[in-house]
Amino acid sequence: MSLTTSHVVPAPRELVWDWHTRTGALTRLTPPFAPITPVTQADKLSDGTTILALPAGLKWVARHDLSNYRRGHRFTDVCTSAPIKLLANWRHVHEFADHPDGTLVTDSVTTRVPGAALKSMFAYRQQQLINDISFLDRIAHLQPEQPLTVAVTGSRGLVGRALSAQLTTAGHEVIQLVRKNPKPGQREWDPFSPDPDLLDGVDVLV
C-alpha cells in the first residue's frame, strides 16, 4: 500500500529542514504508543543509517537513499534489515516545500504495513513537529547567542530522553550522565562521589 500525507508547519523551510538534520529529531517524532524505540539517528540525511529497536530483539535499520536526496527539499529512507525488510517493504520520502504560511511537509510511504497503523503515527508526527517548531519560535528571544552544553541526568527515562531530544533539536549539545557503560556523548558519574571534572565544559546541569 501507499500513503501520502501533507501538513503545513508555520516556519521557514530552511528552519524546518535544519530541525530534521539534528540529533533528537527522530526521538521527538516517534509516538510513545508505537512499538519502536530509536537507538541511533543518521548523522546525515543524504546517506546515513538510522536504527530502531523493535519487540523480540528485532532491529529496524533504515538507510538513506543518496540518489533521491536534495538538500533542503527531500530525503528518503529505506528499510534494509532482515526480516523486517521483507515484511514491511518500507520506503519513506520526506519532502519540504515553501508555502505562503511556512513549509509544506509531505510524507510519502510505500509499505506493507497496514494503513490504519500508519495514519495514527503520522498524525502524531505532524502535530509533534508543529508543536516543537512553534515552541522554538516562542522562546526564540530567550535563546543564548551561542548553543549551550547541557548535562542531563536520568536521560534514559521517558522524560529525560524527550528533554534531551528537544534540547538537541533546539541546537544545543547534550551530555548524558549515566551510572555505567558510557557511550560517545555520555559521561559516567557516581552521584555520591562525582569526579571533579565531571562538569568540565558544561553550561547547564539538569
Regions found by a protein language model. Give the residues of each.
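N-terminal Rossmann NAD(P)H-binding glycine-rich loop of SDR-like oxidoreductase domains
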Residues: L148-A170
